[in-house]
Amino acid sequence: MLSILINAYACSPNMGSEPGMAWNWCVNLANHCELHIITEGEFRDKIEAVLPALPQGKNMHFYYNPVSEEIRKMCWNQGDWRFYKYYREWQWKTYEMAKDICQHTHIDILHQLNMVGFREPGYLWKIPKIPFVWGPIGGLKQFPEAYLKDAGLKMKLFNKLKNRINIYQIKHDKRVTEALHHASLLISSIPDSYKSIKKYQHLESVIIPETGCFPSEDLSAERFDSKEFHAMWVGKFDFRKQLPLALRAIAETKNHNIILDVYGTGNEEQIFSAKQLAAELGIEKQIVWHGNQPNRIVMDAMRKTQVFFFTSISEDTSTVVLEAISNRLPVLCFNACGMAAVIDKKVGQTVELSNPQQSIYDFATTLNCFEKDRNLLKECSQNCKARQQELSWENKAKQMVELYQKT
């Protein structure tokens, strides 16, 4: 059994996002490997509460490197650039802890697992004579600037600047470059990451989406026969999620049988703006505003609706898209970002990133097609079963172990 030292800043059971992603990787890898996991201490109680009950828990050894509550708040306040200074310091201390572990324990592989963003590769790569694996690596997508047309000046400047900083950093950041070239194996979270690493560093990587599926039981196909056609939208009302584009697509269908169920919320201004747009488009009666709901409510809704309508234009691999597949729900989204590696014509439909007006037309056309051809939806739903298995956490872990063994 291979012994793997994993750097996972955020790791916790029963959570989504980065903590849940790292936990699911670790808990599945532990079926095949002995893991030594260095993580921040925020979720220590949660980890230690569930670990004894896991059959593979004996293969999971946690080492905690805690930070202050103030730094934790910076971490989860997206956009707080002050966090990166403290995060780098955390990575250095983790490196020192890792060196100590390696002196007392046999380690076959060093794995930089999360956070997935490419800007912070940590320092495990500096440890000699042990193969270093980095990934899944994310954060390398370029925001499609054609979709900034209706954005405010601040949003336009932020995204254009971020695009340019991303390119500069992947090309010129010394530590990122050193980590990439020291790695025995690189894993890209999405095709955009693969292309950037190949283009700017001339290195190969393997594409494995950072999040995975949980196989579900068989679900009745009767929901696809309902006269009312429900499309489901889930997310924050922030700019990259493109809720206004979804609303305009519903209006463009000119089909009163199509209902859009919106799960999620935003600030007062975003909520008012979204509802005002629905009124201006004359589709108030076709939109149901559910607000923020517990995950179990969202999952239950996925098992009853007809299509998952995902309009985000800047994601790595969104957990909610994988949740749709887990619930046998066909997906309509852009052929971009993490979705491009997950959704194909067997389980849904994608449209190309072009410009907002073209996208509205393309989405509307596809929604009308789905509304008319319920057998197509049934087929996509049935195909989700095989896709679940391909994208399952268990399958990802086996894939990773095979790569470890070749490293």
Where are these regions (language model features)?
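A conserved mid-protein helix/loop that constitutes part of the nucleotide-sugar donor-binding site
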Residues: 20, 229, 238-252
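Donor nucleotide-sugar binding/catalytic pocket of nucleotide-sugar-dependent glycosyltransferases
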Residues: 60-64, 134, 165-220
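Short alpha-helical donor nucleotide-sugar binding micro-motif in glycosyltransferases
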Residues: 180, 292, 300-305
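Glycosyltransferase donor-sugar binding loop
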Residues: 234, 259-274, 291
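Nucleotide-activated donor-binding/catalytic signature segment of Leloir-type glycosyltransferases, i.e.
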Residues: 272-293
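Aromatic "clamp/platform" in nucleotide-sugar-dependent glycosyltransferases that forms part
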Residues: 313
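Short hydrophobic beta-strand element within catalytic cores of glycosyltransferases
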Residues: 330-333
